């Protein structure tokens, strides 16, 4: 195989968000609660919409499930940011066909934003985890294979055999 192991990949994913305390909290709770090695995830998934030169980073993406999670910190409560989020979500949908779910880590009290209590936030995270599990089960029942074969994902041969690469399939390969 190429550059690094699945273990290194997983821990580097968390390292990418170590400076964002709420994002780190929510994402690590989601992943540890899921405890499912067959569900691929990516922190800070890079997404380029087809109609502009900007790019977006999805906080937590589940490519095989067609799903991503945005963790809304305080700035997402501002009117301008809410409008930007709507545009962003529409462009990500167009680029990936992925469903977006959001978890806000703050409450708005008048003009003030305060952090949610961990117990309330944990309940929302647990609901999201149940949603992810249900989505996986639904896809499997419809005949979709959900398996995170880390080594295969990064081998170009996997895509050469298919003789086709689709932009929305989250293709990745290591340079050997």
Residue positions per predicted region:
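Nucleic-acid endo/exonuclease domains
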Residues: 1-176
